[in-house]
Amino acid sequence: MASTHPSPCTESYDPRFDQLVLFNAELELLAEGFRWLEGPVWFGDHQCLLFNDIPNNRTLRWHKQDGVSVFREPSGFANGQTRDRQGRLITCHHSQRELTRIEHNGDVTTLVNNVNGKKLNAPNDVVVKSDGSIWFSDPVYGLLNDYEGGRQTSEQHPALYRLDPSTGEVAAVARDFEGPNGLAFSPDETKLYVAESGGAGESNPNQFIREFEVSADGKSLVSTKIFHKISPGWADGFRVDEQGNIWCGAADGVHCIAPDGTLI
């Protein structure tokens, strides 16, 4: 059963943030007792939330009427996921090292599991562009221990990929990463933001959100810069709202970052 709590821990650093939230809103605890949660996806048409408990190797479903139930077990140590333009669920899997799509009839389609004959690492997070193309990050985190999906050997460098689901063509759009993580497009899709989580440890300098300029044809990336450095901790998953603000998971909660890179 869900419970509500007052939310006195919201901190505003900029008047722009005050226009985004209701400070008398309450924080609602939907469920607890999990090990490590990732990949929340809201299905408004079904009024339910899907999310992954990675170490327990299962995807869970929350609904207001009946609470939490198991949606998929085993999940292939599923991590990030999203919906495509047809409302289907796209999921990153660590143990199978692949991206899948659940069709409307319940069938599961493997979208990609290798590039040029070499296995993917452990796909981490995914976003779908308005043209239907699927962009995903592929770090090695899910190969490093049994907790995240089982120790396996990496066959290629961490990278960011674009998949055309209509043709099956997959191409690396950026390889200069240590550990690509969450990603999302700006509202007009001229920019792609990607979390560079680097290696583990607060002292690692390669932990920040990068901003990429998307090419005119929307199929590649043409330039990059450091957009924002999260502190404390490092950037994990995030989404961009209709005003271009980034809502990003961090070590101490959720950070809201304005389009100019300011923590607000």
PLM regions with names:
Residues 1-264:
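Sequence-structural signature of mature extracellular/luminal beta-sheet repeat domains
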